[in-house]
Amino acid sequence: MTKSGNIETLFSLLDDENETVAVSAMKELLRHENELPEYLAAFQEDDDPLVRRRVHQLQVVLYLRRSRREFSRKLQSPFIDVPDCLLALHLLWFDNDVMPGVAQLWQDFAAAAGNYPLDSLEDLAYFMHKCNFRPMPESTLYPENYCMGTVLEKRVGAASLLLVMLREVASLRPLTLGRLLGEFVLQDESGRLLLPLRNWQIASVNNGQALEYWDNRKFFTFAAYNLFSSAVNSDSFRYILTLAQALNGTDGDGVLSALPYPYNPGKEKTAD
């Protein structure tokens, strides 16, 4: 049987009322990922609501796979496009959000920044105060604080994320993201620091205090791992798999092999 014939046969099973049969067919269809879109487009308006539902499920799986690969690709790129990575990170967690809508929030933020002089740390602090941004400590308990769209809507976000966003729209250069005594800061060329968790105060590094410098790749990896930890905290297998695959750059379930039961079904539950 030709590949197209095999795919058509599998699609013919999507109306089967036996869930096991349909799930098996869907699993096989996902092996033909590159050929699926044209078939899904043809079946998404099928008269049978059961077929439409299962076609939608397949479309969601393909979308999630693309999102994971896209984030992984961006993370491994020699040059990291910050707005694109912020958008990709947001969509890993809020995967029902629409990309253009979230992207528009960033464009509005960048446009607002263009109305302010952002040539000094004082300018940056003033801008963030005027925008009513509230920086929060780094935490795995509030995953939304690492999601650009939610942060821009609610004006509350992880200090690290706010600094990465601010540095991207600032005209002051160079600006370095760093961590000092556990808190994220921005450092200008003269060595002064912008401290978001200290009400956007400006200070200098004291003698003996070592500033740990962070590049974009390190930040986005850190943020994605925090989202992964949030998924574990909430016992959300779907997001555990999504974040693990995005960080690992693969679609397989093998990324869960290092995790304990029940996330890795191959490991039996052991007694305490």
What do these predicted regions represent?
Residues 2-272:
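A structural boundary/capping signal
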